[in-house]
Regions:
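PRPP/pyrophosphate-binding module of the type I phosphoribosyltransferase fold
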Residues: 92, 101-187
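Extended interfacial segments that mediate partner engagement and assembly in macromolecular machines
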Residues: 1-97, 116-117
């Protein structure tokens, strides 16, 4: 696990990326993978606070400015079965510690199959058009910090960012708790 704020150079090099920058806190392997997996699937919502604190420290230290923090929404059934949306809990913790207000203008409109194990093209195809903007006025001309737990291929974040920008957001910056291994990170 690394404590440095990192930008994945592969993500930054992709011309179709809709976000301004993509940041991550750690690499999703070893202890980080185990702990995040517990947070997501092991009924451990209390881990949002220490994870959120680490994210908030990096946001403050690196002066990432945003008008709003927006978490990636889960579909209703997944949130119901899990009991919480881990990205929402992270966003709430980060908002509380940074003073950047949080809002949830996005809604998932399609149920989807699990993304783990799918390739990049399949993920992007599955997630295209997966979100709608509940309140376009909330994001109009605003700089959004989009929060999620794990950045794998970027398909979920891509779909969410496109929806926010199509609704009038000035910019979207992505910040995830972790990034899957195999991608060079810039510090």
């Amino acid at each position: 696990m690394t404590g440095a704020l990192a930008i994945c150079d592969q993500c930054m090099a992709e011309p179709e990326r809709p976000w301004r920058k993509a940041y991550t806190l750690m690499v999703y392997r070893d202890y980080a993978r185990h702990t995040i997996h517990r947070f997501k699937f092991g009924n451990a919502p209390e881990l949002a606070r220490p994870f959120g604190q680490l994210m908030a420290e990096k946001i403050i230290k690196n002066q990432l400015n945003a008008d709003f923090i927006v978490p990636v929404p889960l579909d209703f059934m997944r949130q119901f079965s899990r009991g919480y949306n881990q990205s929402m809990l992270l966003a709430e913790a980060v908002s509380k510690l940074t003073g950047i207000p949080g809002c949830q203008p996005l809604r998932r409109i399609k149920r989807r199959s699990k993304q783990s194990g799918r390739n990049r093209a399949d993920r992007h195809k599955e997630l295209a058009g997966n979100f709608i903007l509940k309140s376009p006025a909330a994001v109009k001309d605003r700089n959004i910090l989009l929060i999620d737990d794990i950045f794998t291929t970027g398909a979920t974040l891509h779909a969410a960012a496109v929806t926010l920008l199509s609704g009038g957001a000035a910019s979207v910056t992505v910040f995830t708790l972790a990034r899957t291994p195999g991608h060079a990170l810039l510090f």
